[in-house]
Amino acid sequence: MDKRVFEKLDVIAGQFSISVLLRGVVDDFVWACTGVYGPNDDGQWTTLWEELSQVRARWPMAWCLVGDFNTIRYPNERLGCDLFSPAMFAFLDFIESNSLVDLPLEGASFTWFRDSGLPSMSRIDKALVSLNWEEHFENVSQRVLHRVISDHYPLLLEAGAVQRGRSAFKFENVVESLGFC
């Protein structure tokens, strides 16, 4: 981590996630970042959602979660899927109860692909953010990058400028705006 950009304040390591509490060096904005690797076993979904909800309870501030959740929200996020499953409902409940936003995906419809026999594709990798995280970072986008070796497409989460409020008064700006320069 570049200490010129972020200061690490705290860390929580869970069974399916690792979370870091960060402070922006330039703007003092404190937020949580969580990397997720969801379970492959349907019986462990409750454990994941409880683990992540405990992170949220400990750090009730701006939050960004990124990773392989190993589940989808809607049937259209998996090729050939037509019905909702209990895992989907649990994921949707987690997103709603924590007031998270699933950022739109640019560049592809799916993030995971298997081409052995019948092709299988789904959007199990994603970035979820809290509203105050999204408001702080301008022009947030989530984009699929080129897949090289893995069966997962890498994601690029990009944020533009940081919201800093009103800019400081500068005499030169006033003089220029009045046409003296």
Residue ranges and their predicted role:
Residues 1-181:
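A shared catalytic/ligand-binding motif for oxyanion handling
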